[in-house]
Amino acid sequence: ISPQEAMLRADGRTLLVVVDTNRPEQVEDADLLMACNRVAVIDHHRVAATYIHNAALGFIEPYASSVGELMTEVLQEVVDQNDILRCEAEALLSGIVLDTKSFTIRTGERTFDAAAYLRRAGADTTDVKKLLQTDMDDTVAKYKILQSAKLYRDLAIAVPEEPQNRVVAASAADEL
């Protein structure tokens, strides 16, 4: 649902679950974060200096490859594998594939165990690959960012000429 719809539905019993970040400035909607009294944070990044302070639950595991890996481990403990929908398994597997660059970085035994579990739950790797494909406009935008990169003290720095969506910007940053 949209942040606006979530804001309309939120009440005193609402639990807002924030995934893949623990920084309030990176959430989809800061107003929604502030409006919810109960917040859970599930993340695989190190705790930032500006972490979400009002979290009732913090599941932050920097040694995990991805939030997909963490959530798969949770699912294995609380849900019967047959109850996981194929689209859910594919969404989790796509997160693992994306964050590990197709299992080439930040992987460990837990990563592969999670992927195997999701395959058994019905995730199709061909469909996962399709989920991760970008359209031509996003590809062009990414390569414009890469083309603008400059080296400074052995670091590549790129500043897009136009505002980009976060997925395109993150993809370009991964390439640098």
What name fits each language-model region?
Residues 1, 5-15, 98-176:
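Hydrophobic helix-and-loop "lid/oligomerization" segment in the mid-to-C-terminal part
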Residues 1-35:
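N-terminal small/polar loop signature for handling phosphorylated ligands or for N-terminal nucleophile
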Residues 3-4, 19-22, 42-45, 74, ...:
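Fold-independent oxyanion-binding glycine-rich loops
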Residues 8-11, 31-34, 51-52, 84-86, ...:
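Solvent-exposed alpha-helices and their adjacent loops that cap or buttress functional pockets
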Residues 15-17, 38-42, 57-60, 156:
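Hydrophobic/aromatic beta-strand patches that form the interior of the parallel beta-sheet core
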Residues 26-28, 50, 105-106, 167:
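Short helix/loop capping segments that flank catalytic or ligand/cofactor-binding pockets
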Residues 31-37, 114-117:
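Catalytic-core regions built around general acid/base machinery
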Residues 44-114:
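Short alpha-helices
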